[in-house]
Amino acid sequence: MSEQIIHFEDYKLGHERLTTGRTITETDFVVHAGHTGDFFPHHMDAEFAKTLPGGQRIAHGTMIFSIGVGLTASLINPVAFSYGYDRLRFVRPVHIGDTIRTRVTISAKEEDPKRPKSGRVVERLEVINQRGEVVLAADHILVVERKA
């Protein structure tokens, strides 16, 4: 994990970075279900999952979102603050044993009328699996301080 100050003016449209990978485990499923109370059989019942397309349990979308966002924390910008996420989509299923990583692309920059000392930056997050397929996509909106 590293810290780097990047002001609003310094963000470049199209800039891309790729995180390290992380393999999804049985433990991830169990811990996430316990934290959220989401024990749907699609995630937790191996016999039920055999009847589904793909024949195996599907990772919780919220878990993949959490892990995918967490992977981006390898770079910390102390002058950027999360405003929220838009356009979250669970594009493909993730299974135990899949390895995911997150591609972060700067997709938009705009003025912030409520905060004249800051601007808004949109990071397009794409969580991709070991086959290079996008499994989750979202827009992360940041409020970023301008240079003084």
What are these regions (language model features)?
Residues 1-13, 94-99, 103-148:
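HotDog/MaoC-like acyl-thioester-processing domains
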Residues 2-84, 147:
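Hot-dog-fold acyl-thioester-processing enzymes
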Residues 41-43, 82-83, 88-90, 114, ...:
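Short, intrinsically disordered/low-complexity patches at protein termini
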Residues 74-96, 102:
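Mid-chain, well-packed structural core segment of small domains
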